[in-house]
Amino acid sequence: DYVEALEARGVPHLLVGGKTFYEREEVDAIRSALTAIEWPEDELSVYAAVHGPLFAVGEEELLEYHAAAHGFPPYRVPKDLPERLQPVARALETLRELHASRNYRPVADTIGRLIAATRAHAGFILWRGGEQVLANVLHISDLARRYEAEGGLSFRGFVDLLREAAGTTEAPEAPILEEGSE
């Protein structure tokens, strides 16, 4: 792949085309987490968010937690969990807190709190093409601000918008020009 070869050699470049914004793994990770925040009773969304790159909890721990807690209910996190299951509990507590406050603050603020709580900036920048990955993640916050500026009223509405957009292939990635490019 040309992009990977350019990135591996540190060659400044600007990709036009390629994967669309909504098909990117990092965008899917944020969308999954926002879906879990809006619908914490949706076990599949919660599983996807907690297992995905934001919380990065392993399958073994998730399956063990699921058996011990009878699911992934963010409002019924057991107190007597073994240490190896604490990352699951912390992730569920984060989702619960963000769910409880999501309608009392701007959508972009909830996204910012999610990114801060999971230290996503640090993780995403280490990915291949990390600057582009991080630009895409930050672009989601920009989309949230635009959504509200254009009259969007609810967190759920923004999540629905992201989910609908994921079914299309029209939006390009957030443009960034590599340092030193002209």
Per-segment meaning from a language model:
Residues 1-55, 59-63, 74-79, 83, ...:
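Conserved motor-region signature of P-loop NTPase helicases/translocases
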Residues 67-70:
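Amphipathic, charged-and-aliphatic alpha-helical interface segments
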